[in-house]
Curated annotation (Swiss-Prot):
Pfam families: Inositol_P (PF00459)
Enzyme class, broadest EC rank: hydrolase
SUPFAM superfamilies associated with the record: Carbohydrate phosphatase (SSF56655)
Subunit annotation: Homodimer.
Family the entry assigns: Belongs to the inositol monophosphatase superfamily. FBPase class 4 family.
Biological process per Gene Ontology, one example term: inositol metabolic process
Gene from which this protein is expressed: suhB
Identification of the protein by name: Fructose-1,6-bisphosphatase/inositol-1-monophosphatase
Signal peptide (UniProt feature, chain positions): none
Enzyme Commission (EC) number: 3.1.3.11, 3.1.3.25
PANTHER family cross-referenced by the UniProt entry: INOSITOL MONOPHOSPHATASE (PTHR20854), INOSITOL-1-MONOPHOSPHATASE-RELATED (PTHR20854:SF4)
Entry function: Phosphatase with broad specificity; it can dephosphorylate fructose 1,6-bisphosphate (FBP) and inositol-1-phosphate (IMP). However, while possessing a high FBPase activity in vitro, does not participate in gluconeogenesis in vivo.
Species for this entry: Thermococcus kodakarensis (strain ATCC BAA-918 / JCM 12380 / KOD1)
Remaining remarks: Is not able to complement the defect of the fbp deletion under gluconeogenic conditions, probably due to insufficient transcription.
Length: 256
């Protein structure tokens, strides 16, 4: 069976938007209602969003990997790796940086990725070999001058010397959004070395960055592979070009 993933992704995003946006910035959104399969706290808005996702995707007969419930194995060739709401803390706190992320795999190979940024309703999508798009328009990574890069950098004390080698450092609190920003050239890189990144966070964004001309690796510079798991945690480097990748890898070698 073939699927129109673009239509499925956008329709799902629009239903999520309709159901969860009334909760934006409310105390109700941030209420703790349990723990997910990784042992992290599940917020009320996460539960609402995931219920919508499962209602839409499970009847398609595909496998689903989601942050809260874990893996729903339907025995399909297709696996949907999804984060219904990346940036749920931002959402609950009234910070307008959060997104729906959906990556499609046939076997272990990515075949489609979409990120829907609820505010301001930006729809990013990519297919292998077909490029990356924002609201239907082709996007490409930026080509920053050396030393003038803008980088999103997540750390717990490691590699702090990197801050001196780039011009701007940002931490937006929603890595799906940040990967989309790298793909469209608004950021030059995202670097997270907290051993905290889940496949559900980045399944769509990794494809988006690569199709926009960027590079995505692990912390050793090896090609980043999205695992079809809800519990795996890892590190990631996503950058606009090889020069910035080398700057980051050298900074990691220099750390005490």
């Amino acid at each position: 069976m073939e699927f129109n993933w673009s239509e499925i992704a956008l329709n799902t995003a629009k239903e999520l938007e309709e159901k969860i946006m009334p909760l934006f910035g409310t105390k109700k959104a941030g209420e703790n209602v349990g723990t997910n399969v990784s042992g992290d706290v599940t917020k009320y808005v996460d539960k609402v969003a995931e219920d919508i996702i499962l209602k839409r995707l499970v009847p398609l007969g595909v496998n689903v990997v989601s942050e809260e419930v874990g893996t729903v194995d339907s025995g399909s060739d297709y696996t949907v790796v999804v984060d219904p709401l990346d940036g749920s803390y931002n959402f609950s706190a009234g910070i307008p940086i959060f997104a729906f992320s959906l990556g499609i795999f046939k076997g272990k190979k990515p075949v489609y990725g979409a990120i829907y940024e609820f505010l301001p309703e930006n729809f990013y999508e990519a297919k292998p070999g077909k490029g990356a798009y924002l609201n239907g328009e082709r996007i490409r990574v930026n080509e920053p001058e050396p030393g003038k890069e803008a980088l999103s950098f997540y750390t717990r004390g490691r590699c702090l010397g990197l801050v001196k080698k780039v011009k701007r450092v940002r931490v937006l609190g929603a890595i799906a959004v940040e990967l989309a920003y790298v793909a469209r050239g608004s950021l030059d890189g995202v670097f997270d070395i907290r051993n905290y990144v889940r496949p559900t966070d980045v399944a769509a964004g990794v494809l988006l960055v690569r199709e926009a001309g960027g590079i995505v690796t692990d912390e050793r510079g090896r090609e980043f592979e999205v695992k079809l798991s809800a519990t795996e945690k890892t590190n990631i480097i996503a950058v606009a070009n090889e020069r910035l990748l080398n700057t980051i890898l050298e900074a990691m070698k220099d750390e005490p």
